[in-house]
């Protein structure tokens, strides 16, 4: 079979649509959360303005009658409420900023995924050696190699997608044939 056809078949089996859909769902949720928080922020500001008006009215009335301790206590309560609302507004603004930063990051990741999914297979075949292509194919299947020396692989780790287990195979054992190693890897996948 032609390597280009093989790579096309392998590429067709991989889909980024789920990741893109997930990212879009997260983006919609973040937008919805931002709108909700903006509404809460506007509501909190309106409450704060009402509290400030009430406080000002109370202060005016207290100025005329400074002997009333109830009014003074009410003014203090309004001041505490004003401070609590101001803190809530600050917290909402911080959360909104963090949400916007997360949205920007997710959009950048979405663009990267879209760019990667649009790269032609032919350029990968032309630019990579057959050994590099084999290693990429193994990695996509869940097989990685660990080397003590860069030129020689000493251990193979196989991650099974069906059982979520990781099996290791020592490649330094001389009794293992290429046939045995290949069968072992495929059995573990």
From Swiss-Prot:
Coiled coil regions in record: 36-119
SUPFAM superfamilies noted in UniProt: Kinetochore globular domain (SSF143026)
Q: Where in the cell is it found?
A: Nucleus; Chromosome, Centromere, Kinetochore
According to its UniProt entry, the protein's GO biological process terms are: cell division; chromosome segregation; sister chromatid biorientation
Looking up CDD domains in the UniProt record yields:
RWD_Spc24 (cd11565)
Q: What would be one Gene Ontology cellular-component term for the protein?
A: nucleus
Q: Which is an annotated Pfam family here?
A: Spc24
Transmembrane stretches in the record are none
Q: Which UniProt keywords apply?
A: Cell cycle, Cell division, Centromere, Chromosome, Coiled coil, Kinetochore, Mitosis, Nucleus
Q: Which InterPro entries match?
A: Ndc80_Spc24, Spc24_Fungi_globular_sf
- What this chain does, per the record? Acts as a component of the essential kinetochore-associated NDC80 complex, which is required for chromosome segregation and spindle checkpoint activity.
Give the protein family: Belongs to the SPC24 family.
Q: How does it assemble?
A: Component of the NDC80 complex, which consists of NDC80, NUF2, SPC24 and SPC25.
For this entry, the protein name equals Probable kinetochore protein SPC24
Chain's gene name: SPC24
